[in-house]
Amino acid sequence: DAQLRTEYSVKALTDAGVEVEQLDLQRGDWDRNKGQEICQNDLAKYGDQIEVVFCNNDDMAIGALQAIQAAGRTVNKDIYLVGVDALDAAKNEVAKGNMTGTVLNDAKGQATQAVECMEELLGGKTFEADHQSVYVDYVKVTPDNVKDFQ
């Protein structure tokens, strides 16, 4: 899931016509301190070349935010920061303008889809071998809609 998150985040930018140069890709092990350390090191190495930081969870994004602020950069002004999970702490940072956004891994949508698949199976429907996975779209949480999720 995390590899796909990264791949499709970059793809969304390129599909929108944004030129992308990936400066670094590291594992933050879902850890705030590691996210801060990686971002701090990258900011020291790449400086203003860094325009966007994608983190595959909000805790790492909050760590990255700490590094960004310590480096004197301003999210949504000279750098963008996106996390995943729509944790309360991240939604608060989005509302304050300190994060560009987060992405909700839609548990309610997943549950609904699971029930629909179960009903289809109980009704006798079979699924082909190459259709064994069902993907539920993530939900973007931005400053424009964050109040809907708090």
Predicted regions and their residues:
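Conserved beta-strand scaffold positions in the cores of enzyme catalytic domains, especially
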Residues: 22-25, 81, 102, 140
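Flexible loop/hinge segments that line or gate small-molecule binding clefts
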Residues: 85-100, 139-141
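Hinge/cleft segment of the Venus flytrap/periplasmic-binding protein
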Residues: 1, 11-16, 106-150
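Class I S-adenosyl-L-methionine
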Residues: 7-17, 65, 69, 95, ...
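Extracytoplasmic ligand-binding site segments that recognize negatively charged/polar headgroups
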Residues: 1-12, 20-21, 27-33, 111
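Short beta-strand elements at the ligand-binding edges of bilobed clamshell
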Residues: 25, 96-108
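Hydrophobic alpha-helical
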Residues: 9, 24, 28-92
